[in-house]
């Protein structure tokens, strides 16, 4: 009640209960059976008829269709009559609910929608705005232009080597100068819009936890096991209600060393590891796109472990 966060999220984020115990408590409170998404049978082709992000936002996910036509549904929120009717209408069948935690549901979504998530993370921008994407490095026209320019330069070097060298040096110097001037102008013009708002300690003290927004901190890691022992304690010192702060470590699936280093560092309960599905390009921006799929904060922060 103090923070306005769901009670189950408060318990887990404070480390008061484990996911397994929470699952049992929720099931007992809601009068539902416990559903272990890690071991229960699933029909992934059936589940993928829906949007994973939409299902996560609504705190439920279909698992499989039973022989009698009913649908097994995992839920991380109580089942009211209105909610039961809404979900039954969505799956167009009678439903059998099982209780899970919200983290269970997110891990289940990552497993079921792994290919879709990986594809969306790598290719969504190129499909939506090709001109803003670097997926295509050079067009055919650009390749032809560079080849032609190279041939002209080679001919000039062969015929007028000294004069060509002088021209190239001047051209590169002018290009460097233009870049420097451009960055300076952008910095000066942008500085006019900088806003600094000073907050006193008294104003901070008057803030109520209930009024604070929820934050997600995305921490992309790749072969960074050597920094984890310092990184985790530093992030754990963030002075913010843990039930309103989620820290997601984004680790490539095959990077076992980094994952083991995080486990060994014993991070707080509101720190989670998202295993990035295999795919190309294997970059931090792609990992961050995967993290966006699971982020639940009103505000989002990116923390680069290398910094």
Region roles according to the model:
Residues 2-5, 54-57, 65-69, 89-92, ...:
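Short flexible coil/turn linkers enriched for glycine and charged/polar residues
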Residues 50-53, 109-117, 286-293:
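Short, surface-exposed amphipathic charged segments that create phosphate/polyanion-binding patches used
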Residues 1-13:
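N-terminal, charged amphipathic alpha-helical interaction modules
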Residues 119-207:
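N-terminal membrane-anchoring/stem segments of glycan-assembly enzymes
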Residues 13-90:
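Polyanionic, low-complexity intrinsically disordered segments
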Residues 87-125:
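Extended, hydrophilic extramembrane loops/domains of integral membrane proteins
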Residues 199-307:
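Internal catalytic domains of large membrane-associated glycosyltransferases
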